[in-house]
Amino acid sequence: MSRRKNAEKRIVNPDPVYRNRLVNMLVNRILKNGKKSLAYRILYKAMKNIKTKTQKNPLFILRQAIRKATPKVAVKARRVGGSTYQVPVEIQSSQGKALAIRWLLTSAKKRAGRNFISKLSNEIIDTARDTGNTIRKKEETHRMAESNRAFAHFR
């Protein structure tokens, strides 16, 4: 880690089709081995699936899903006097959004299904409807933070 100055935040450019930064953030997380065009193709086909299944704007559904999956608090392990406490910490919106995207993709990968396109589209739709593993993960994180609220003064 550099001691000179804080690293600049990298600005995420919007994607070419939807002109949205959120879509590009999702593509960058889908990306494997530098194959960005494949990641774009997967996401755009998933968005097309969402449009056919819901008859609504897929970008609206995606935004809604990520908004509902974004956590407000997280727990951080903090060692105090030989024992480790899970300390609840409020997180910034950008960090919460990144967590929501990560949870969305891991939940989609764990789903049963033929291919990743259908799994991803189904997970996005389920998250937008307040069901699915992504929402369960968010609620579990909030529950953890609530149960460890007594350790909040260890920040």
From Swiss-Prot:
**Annotated Gene3D superfamilies:** Ribosomal protein S7 domain
Q: Which Pfam families match?
A: Ribosomal_S7
The record's subcellular location field reads:
Plastid, Chloroplast
Q: Which UniProt keywords apply?
A: Chloroplast, Plastid, Ribonucleoprotein, Ribosomal protein, RNA-binding, rRNA-binding
Its function, per the record, reads: One of the primary rRNA binding proteins, it binds directly to 16S rRNA where it nucleates assembly of the head domain of the 30S subunit.
Q: How does it assemble?
A: Part of the 30S ribosomal subunit.
The identity of this protein, by name, is Small ribosomal subunit protein uS7c
List the gene name. rps7
